[in-house]
UniProtKB/Swiss-Prot annotation:
GO terms for biological process: red, far-red light phototransduction. The keyword Aminoacyl-tRNA synthetase does not apply. GO terms for cellular component: COP9 signalosome; cytoplasm. The keyword Glycosyltransferase does not apply. Belongs to the CSN1 family. This is COP9 signalosome complex subunit 1. Component of the COP9 signalosome complex (CSN), a complex involved in various cellular and developmental processes such as photomorphogenesis and auxin and jasmonate responses. The CSN complex is an essential regulator of the ubiquitin (Ubl) conjugation pathway by mediating the deneddylation of the cullin subunits of SCF-type E3 ligase complexes, leading to decrease the Ubl ligase activity of SCF. It is involved in repression of photomorphogenesis in darkness by regulating the activity of COP1-containing Ubl ligase complexes. It comes from the Eukaryota. It is found in: Cytoplasm; Nucleus. Its main location: cytoplasm. Keywords: Cytoplasm, Developmental protein, Nucleus, Phytochrome signaling pathway, Signalosome. Component of the CSN complex, probably composed of CSN1, CSN2, CSN3, CSN4, CSN5 (CSN5A or CSN5B), CSN6 (CSN6A or CSN6B), CSN7 and CSN8. It comes from Brassica oleracea (Wild cabbage). The lineage of its organism: Eukaryota, Viridiplantae, Streptophyta, Embryophyta, Tracheophyta.
């Protein structure tokens, strides 16, 4: 699915709870994430 593709491609910071069908967004440090790209 699109969400899984975006997560594995590091486009969004999140994890998927496949049992409960919930997408948990990680609130990453935006400044740190910017410098890592």
């Amino acid at each position: 699915e699109l969400e899984a593709l975006l997560i594995t491609d590091n486009q969004i910071q999140a994890r998927i709870d496949s049992h409960n069908k919930i997408l948990y967004a990680r609130h990453a440090d935006q400044r740190n994430a910017t410098f890592q790209k």
